[in-house]
Amino acid sequence: MADVFESLELLFDRPNEPLITPKGENNSVFQLTEQFLTEDYANNGIELNNRFGDDASEKIPLKNLSKLPEFKIATQLPKDAEFSLFLPKHQEMANELLGVLMDVPENELQDLLSTCAFARVNLNPQLFNYCYSVALMHRRDTRKVRVKNFAEVFPSKFLDSQVFTQARETAAVIPPDVPRIPIIIPRDYTATDLEEEHRLAYWREDIGINLHHYHWHLVYPFTANDLSIVAKDRRGELFFYMHQQVIARFNCERLCNSLKRVKKFSNWREPIPEAYFPKLDSLTSSRGWPPRQSGMQWQDLNRAAEGLFVTIDEMERWRRNVEEAIATGTVRLPNGQTRPLDIDTLGNMLESSALSPNRELYGSIHNNGHSFTAYMHDPEHRYLEQFGVIADEATTMRDPFFYRWHAYIDDVFQKHKESAYVRPYTRSELENPGVQVRSVSVETPGGQPNTLNTFWMLSDVNLSRGLDFSDNGPVYARFTHLNYRHFSYRINVNNTGSSRRTTVRIFITPKFDERNVPWIFSDQRKMCIEMDRFVTVLNAGENNIVRQSTESSITIPFEQTFRDLSAQGNDPRRDELATFNYCGCGWPQHMLVPKGTEAGMPFQLFVMLSNYDLDRIDQDDGKQLTCVEASSFCGLKDKKYPDRRAMGFPFDRPSSSATSLQDFILPNMGLQDITIQLQNVTEPNPRNPPMSV
């Protein structure tokens, strides 16, 4: 019999299929009672369930609940509808369901299994999957339950819609024990290079990048009845920093592709020239995602079904109030009092999360911006159209307009950082007395000195867990993505003092702007992308620090982005892999390095060894934890953010004196010119399953 953790994991399997059918690779069947049957299966559900059970390798009994949970709001979402947290009505539904799942008494796991099974049977599969994932991450008794890879459970959110007809044919015709040829996904399936934004499709539509965004919002939801789920340490600041780094990385990629930095969307009444045709179909709704034509505009939203009533006038009023808060350095509270504005508060105001200090006054600018864009084609629900990809956390980064909108959001944060209420760093805050960086470099095995190399890779993703109503057995899709040759940082440091700890902060930045001229510091600081941050010990005298690119505190390993959960069932690292539920929101390892150019694009490597006395947090540093990957973007579970400095330090604010990055350098910092060169070759991923040929 499957243990309760394995049974909970099976609730992710084939989300659009009813629970009466077998789940998982072992053909496991939940033994349902009348309590768990919907009206559709009231007459023959038990008989069907028993028939499936005759062929099952294991049967999972479900405990009858003494009191059935009530879902007065959540049941209003049809099972074949799309779900979006940006919609007020859907937020209410999620809060109701999440509250029920969190309220099951701790360690009553059979009750939890039955409650979750009842919710899965009766509610929309996407709504259930989101709330179930958040609950598993935030309940103390389910930390060993692995949240399944969202791209494998809902593959239609990530892959060309044409794939699924071929996938069903493969599943139906080829026996599971026969090697199956992967279905090839073309690199250019959403547009051609006649559309200049398509040059960035490899980045915007990357499965790992979109999983990163979805997973980050699972770990940091902006709404819940239980505020402890939302109120994590420096949550609003992390919303700023994660998205600021996304925009900086996107702008680096634009320069690599001979495009200008993204233009912020600040005039909310002008036409939007960026079109997007996603070429995705939803397996939940059996409809295609709506495209956006060039030249469409935001319009007032009046959609009763989603509880979405908001006007552009309201958005502009909220913007004026936020601008006033930045200009005065104060936030007005509902009771009329004020308090100082800081970056964490501003993040919660702008998103806005349940922690917003005054939602009536400051509104929900970020979230409604997504909704305005997602409903331009049907703002009044006249044509019964669903939202566009920008309103789904798993698909939003595919849309070119996502970056224009977030360039505006980031600009608001930057105005705060540049205001009179955020002072530039003093020399004593930046320096590390007695520490001198003599040289910094990067080294790629077999490569040129101070040169990073990127290339294309073919990787497989298993579709079978999300391929409803088809035979078991793996069905692979093969897609092309960017990758890089692993490298090491080498830092030579002289420490004239005694042995001490230091935080090593590593960034890279393009050397020239889009006009091919050197940057001014006020612009270049916003283009600095964090590559790594770690604490190390400096001995007295000379120190040679070597750090592998794969150890980055920004990223999660490739295996965790595209992890095969079925293979982890008996893995001795099960607890460690389950902790991925939390830290899995990190940046994908294969996208750590910008693409560069075939000729080689000039970048600069910046390394800083900061004063640990000003960095340290009085808690365990996380090294005793099984999962410390991606702490820069994800924090540490149930702990404070592992760095006392402002996120993005030392580039999060202007300098009082430096006009260039070279001017900014102090003895405890190093700057080195490097080159990023694209090797325009495509290689198969050695991790691809052996049966894919």
From Swiss-Prot:
Q: Catalytic center at which residues?
A: E351
Q: Give the EC number(s) under which this enzyme is classified.
A: 1.14.18.1
Fetch the PROSITE patterns from UniProt: HEMOCYANIN_1, HEMOCYANIN_2, TYROSINASE_2
Q: Which cysteines are joined by disulfide bonds?
A: C583-C627, C585-C634
Requisite cofactors: Cu(2+)
Among InterPro entries, the record links this protein to: Di-copper_centre_dom_sf, Hemocyanin/hexamerin, Hemocyanin/hexamerin_mid_dom, Hemocyanin_C, Hemocyanin_C_sf, Hemocyanin_N, Hemocyanin_N_sf, Ig_E-set
- Annotated binding of Cu cation B, by residue: H366, H370, H406
Gene3D superfamilies reported in the protein's UniProt record? Di-copper center containing domain from catechol oxidase (1.10.1280.10), Hemocyanin, C-terminal domain (2.60.40.1520), Hemocyanin, N-terminal domain (1.20.1370.10)
Keywords (A to Z) from UniProt: Copper, Disulfide bond, Glycoprotein, Melanin biosynthesis, Metal-binding, Monooxygenase, Oxidoreductase, Secreted, Zymogen
Proregion residues are 1-51
**Subunit annotation:** Heterodimer.
What does this protein's UniProt record list under function?
This is a copper-containing oxidase that functions in the formation of pigments such as melanins and other polyphenolic compounds. Catalyzes the rate-limiting conversions of tyrosine to DOPA, DOPA to DOPA-quinone and possibly 5,6 dihydroxyindole to indole-5'6 quinone.
Q: Which family does it belong to?
A: Belongs to the tyrosinase family.
The cross-references to PANTHER family, in alphabetical order and at most eight, read:
LARVAL STORAGE PROTEIN/PHENOLOXIDASE, PHENOLOXIDASE 2-RELATED
Please identify the protein, giving its name as recorded: Phenoloxidase subunit 2
Q: Which organism is it from?
A: Bombyx mori (Silk moth)
**High-level lineage:** Eukaryota, Metazoa, Ecdysozoa, Arthropoda, Hexapoda
